[in-house]
Design a protein with these regions (language model features):
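Conserved N-terminal phosphate-binding loop of PLP-dependent enzymes in the Aspartate aminotransferase
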Residues: 2-460
Length: 460
């Protein structure tokens, strides 16, 4: 089971800088009644994040009602790519609300048409059909459904296999967790699909062999033949560690998929819309998938997701056979269009690339200083993961990672709870609007948190 942060107010050092302000004990004593209500009325699973009661957020900063201000390195779990509450998104939402159309199911509306066309134009060929959804889990399950249906039509009842990767995360619904690669999240599933096959992810840290031959050998050892595979799905970078695969591996994978009429699916839910310094993360690999799943940063705010893909695949189902209750909700669509336009046309992709270089340089210095407990640093653009390990080895150290996040929170630097293998990865993902000065200040604060956590754990 994951760990909950302590909700008992603790006196901490005051902070007052351009980007951070801590003026109360943490959490703020006045916020405790709200925290207690949430813990009383919500499931325990909702207690896993640092106990700040958000009041408002702007740009790359988050505020409570009690005078505290955090530099946000979470983006609300990689959602607010365009920044928190930018005026363009707020105005788009207000305009749509005032227009008076709040929901219309799958009946046509102009707003949905504009967003679908815009996404179709910015996506590379042949990804020209757009199916709007609500959540990332919905998108990944839809992509697998399309891949299997395509496989059945192309190769008959035996071509239904789905290949995914160990350590991968594709959502929390049944199908999404079956294709996911985290065993602890599957313990409740008593009848795992025997036609879902997993292979090691070539991150170069926990999987040393990053050759595509290892992929082929793993499938062969499992008795999986290419003719029985309908699709391969992978995160563009593994969310649990911000880990990318080697370019040559992905290019070989794409070639193998083409040769065997297998759909290649990129889960871009964390990677798309500028996060990695490219519009779509798969651009780093020089390939184009058959389907991609989008979410999170597509709207920088409201719930929107999408599957974007080849027309022949997207059109497999006939009228009314593949729909969703809230597909293309007009308010969410308005937010998404404003978000994507701001990212694409407002220089945020370029900023992510430039600021990412500064971020990774600073993190490399921290990793070098703490080489005994930082097993690896992964990332590109404005996403990074510090893989914390038990001193001198590769075993993940979830305790020190948790301590680092907690200490950073007390210093006015907001990260979400550790993720990845053994809960050992401190993940960093600020809004793409962040500035050089804010990054440098955040790196310094994170360095202090790691210094303190390292000293405390060494003394135990």
């Amino acid at each position: 089971m994951g760990k909950a942060f302590d909700c008992t107010p603790k006196v901490v050092k005051r902070v007052d800088t351009e980007f951070r302000k801590i003026v109360t004990p943490i959490p703020a004593p006045e916020s405790v009644p709200v925290l207690e209500t949430l813990r009383r009325c919500e499931p325990v699973s909702m207690t896993g994040q640092p106990p700040i009661v958000w009041d408002r957020a702007d740009g790359f900063q988050v505020y409570d009602r009690f005078g505290n201000m955090w530099l946000d390195w979470s983006s609300g779990v990689l959602v607010t790519n365009a920044g928190h509450a930018p005026k363009e998104i707020k105005q788009a939402i207000v305009d749509q609300v005032e227009k008076g159309l709040l929901h219309n199911y799958c009946f046509p509306n102009a707003e949905r048409a504009v967003l679908a066309e815009y996404l179709s134009k910015i996506a590379p060929a042949p990804l020209k059909k757009v199916f709007l959804l609500t959540t990332g889990s919905e998108a990944t399950e839809c992509a697998v459904k399309l891949a299997r249906t395509h496989g059945l039509k192309a190769g008959g009842p035996e071509k239904i296999g789905i290949v995914s990767f160990e350590g991968g995360f594709h959502g929390r619904t049944l199908g999404a967790q079956m294709i996911g690669g985290i065993p602890s999240l599957k313990q409740w599933i008593v009848n795992l699909d025997p036609d879902i096959h997993q292979v090691p992810f070539p991150d170069g840290f926990r999987t040393r062999d990053t050759s595509f031959d290892f992929f082929l050998k793993t499938l062969a050892d499992k008795g999986v033949k290419p003719g029985r595979v309908a699709g391969v799905i992978l995160e563009t970078f593994q969310g649990g560690g911000a880990s990318f695969a080697p370019t040559e591996y992905i290019q070989a994978l794409a070639k193998w998929c083409r040769e065997h009429n297998i759909l290649l699916i990129f889960d871009e839910i964390q990677a798309a819309f500028g996060r990695t310094g490219k519009l779509f993360g798969f651009e780093h690999y020089g390939v184009v998938p058959d389907l991609m799943c989008c979410g999170k940063g597509i709207s920088s705010s409201l719930p929107v997701a999408a599957v974007i893909g080849r027309a022949d695949v997207m059109d497999i189902y006939g009228p009314a056979e593949m729909t969703s209750t809230h597909s293309g909700n007009p308010i969410c669509v308005a937010a998404a269009l404003a978000s994507v336009k701001k990212i694409v046309e407002g220089g945020l992709i370029e900023n992510a690339r430039a600021m990412g270089d500064i971020l990774l340089e600073g993190l490399q210095q921290i990793a070098k200083r703490h080489a005994g407990i930082v097993g690896a640093l992964h990332g590109r653009g404005l996403v990074a993961g510090l893989h914390m390990v038990r001193r001198g080895g590769k075993e993940p150290d979830g305790d020190i990672a948790f301590s680092i996040v907690e200490k950073a929170f007390q210093k006015g630097l907001l990260l979400f709870a550790p993720v990845g293998f053994g809960g050992g990865t401190v993940k960093i993902a600020p809004p793409l609007t962040i500035t050089k000065e804010a990054i440098l200040e955040g790196v310094a604060a994170l360095g202090e948190a790691i210094d303190e956590a390292s000293a405390e754990h060494a003394a135990r």
